[in-house]
């Protein structure tokens, strides 16, 4: 059917329903939010080992990092609003990006411990329905601290490692700071 044919038929149907005694017609659709998670994003640092040629981050490779007090205040703000419709989601994804987030693994570990403790203490409905998500260049993935964090949180963890395709393609854009050396071999090791 085209629009010109269908629209008059729909109007006739609604008129028949209305005159048949149905005055409150509602089209019921399942909520688009059903099964959707609330995303809370922490930019824990602007620092990175790389100087990717297409990086979107303004002021990239600055040593700026998120203070613990800022992270704690943000967590408290979010968890205090459990009854707010803007936070009425079945689950939550606590997302960590940068720069390179794993450069701040100690801060991230402290943030995640606080989130888990507070959700438990408050009996928050997200306590058994959360994930920690990371977008990383993968260079620090094998570090002892990162691996310890992964083991501790593995049941609630998603990690995306950015690779641009083949080694040649990756190394064209994803180079170390102050160098043209590509990072592919360090990521896939």
Segments predicted by a language model, with ranges:
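Hydrophobic core segments within long, regular secondary-structure runs in both alpha-
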Residues: 72-75, 112
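Canonical Radical SAM [4Fe-4S] cluster-binding loop centered on the CxxxCxxC motif
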Residues: 34-35, 39-70
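Acidic metal-phosphate-binding loop of nucleotide-sugar-dependent transferases
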Residues: 59, 100-101, 138-139
